[in-house]
A protein has these predicted regions:
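Nucleotide-sugar donor phosphate/pyrophosphate-binding loop at the beta->alpha transition
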Residues: 95-97, 106-125
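Donor nucleotide-sugar binding/catalytic pocket of nucleotide-sugar-dependent glycosyltransferases
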Residues: 121-167, 173
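Short alpha-helical donor nucleotide-sugar binding micro-motif in glycosyltransferases
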Residues: 127, 235-240, 321
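Conserved donor-binding/catalytic core segment of Leloir-type glycosyltransferases
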Residues: 168-206
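Nucleotide-activated donor-binding/catalytic signature segment of Leloir-type glycosyltransferases, i.e.
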Residues: 213-231
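Aromatic "clamp/platform" in nucleotide-sugar-dependent glycosyltransferases that forms part
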Residues: 248
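Short hydrophobic beta-strand element within catalytic cores of glycosyltransferases
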Residues: 265-268, 278
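A charged, aromatic-enriched C-terminal amphipathic alpha-helix characteristic of glycosyltransferases
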Residues: 298-339
Length: 347
């Protein structure tokens, strides 16, 4: 069972990761139940209406966990549903694992004057009760360990290289070179830095979010196309000459792998997430000057980008997830990890 506050129709790396993991676990022979806000009464998050927040979910959460009786329970998010599942597990003496997907302390600080130490204390409390906390990169693992987090293990991310693959540059009729941004358009994503950087060609923004209207008005020369999905997203991405990843707060950045799978190099700041994903000078460029990184990335070999992505399929990511659950079993965790005879992913 996977419990998550982030699920469809949200569009973000957490949802993609969990959906792909659930699907691949099903292919490996497990019955998977995803418990998401879809199954509860919800209200829209005041600052981000696309996010639905469950209302008083504890009783229904307890009922669903008890009815499914999972051999392994993974709490993927620290939201209302994650807290309800955590509370039930602790009350019933059930072991569980968690994962650290989002740098909430930095996100919160970008929106309100909340000190980092307070946010990290809350996250230590949440994850500290789990048997393992799954983290996507070595850099974030070290940062969390330095802040007192325990039982941290690696769970890398993946990319669908059948959907994301090189395509015709002619798909986009824009002046070259084309620098693309892909993702939510929100203050914590630092999209304004990308839009403000000097660039001789075109800027393409693929995505949507609460900051879109303001940024689109401020940067009329940029092309905003909204969210794109599947092969349509891949076609837009493959037609770009470089993808720019301006975020300073992501734990990984799935779009980096998606760009590489399309043969498109990435320009990013040298911070946690990109440091672990981008091979500087081979699949992208890391630089404190984002425009300089983007210009240098234009000279990189698309074949090297594609080769990096081919080593990071979702099957590999899910096998690592499975192995971490199995390692808990070897350390005498009370629940067991074993395949069910049927495959069912709901939520």
């Amino acid at each position: 069972m996977i419990v998550t506050d982030a699920w469809f129709p949200q569009t973000n790396g957490v949802v993609t990761t969990l959906a792909q993991t659930a699907a691949w676990l099903g292919r490996f022979g497990y019955e998977v139940r995803v418990v998401s806000p879809r199954e509860f009464r919800t209200f829209p998050c005041p600052t981000y209406p696309e996010i639905r927040v469950a209302v008083f979910p504890y009783r229904e959460m307890a009922r669903r966990i008890a009815a499914f009786n999972p051999h392994a329970l993974h709490i993927a998010t620290e939201g209302v549903l994650g807290c309800a599942a955590r509370r039930y597990c602790l009350s019933e003496g059930l072991r569980f694992t968690t994962s650290y997907h989002t740098q909430f302390p930095q996100y919160l600080r970008s929106r309100a004057p909340i000190p980092l130490w307070a946010s990290y204390r809350a996250l230590r409390w949440f994850h500290g009760a789990g048997e393992r906390c799954f983290v996507s990169t070595s850099t974030v693992t070290r940062e969390l360990a330095a802040r007192g987090f325990r039982h941290l293990v690696r769970w890398q991310r993946g990319v669908d290289t059948e959907v994301f693959q090189p395509g015709p540059k002619e798909f986009l009729d824009l002046p070259r070179p084309i620098a693309a941004y892909v993702g939510r358009i929100a203050v914590e994503k630092n999209v304004g830095t990308f839009l403000a950087m000097p660039w001789a060609g075109s800027k393409l923004v693929i995505g949507d979010g609460p900051a879109r209207a303001e940024l689109e008005a401020q940067h009329p020369a940029a092309r905003f196309v909204g969210f794109r999905f599947g092969s349509d997203l891949a076609s837009h991405l493959a037609a770009a000459d470089v993808m720019v990843f301006p975020s300073l707060t992501d734990t990984f950045g799935l779009v980096n792998l998606e760009a590489m799978a399309c043969g498109v190099p990435v320009a990013a700041f040298p911070v946690a997430g990109p440091i672990d994903v981008i091979d500087d000078g081979v699949t992208g460029v890391l630089d404190v000057d984002l425009a300089r990184a983007a210009r240098r990335a234009l000279d990189l070999n698309p074949a090297d980008c594609r080769a990096r992505a081919l080593r990071s399929g979702w099957d590999v990511s899910t096998r690592e997830f499975e192995a971490q659950l199995a390692s808990c079993q070897r350390h005498e965790v009370s629940w067991r990890v074993r395949p069910h005879p049927a495959v069912s992913a709901t939520g």
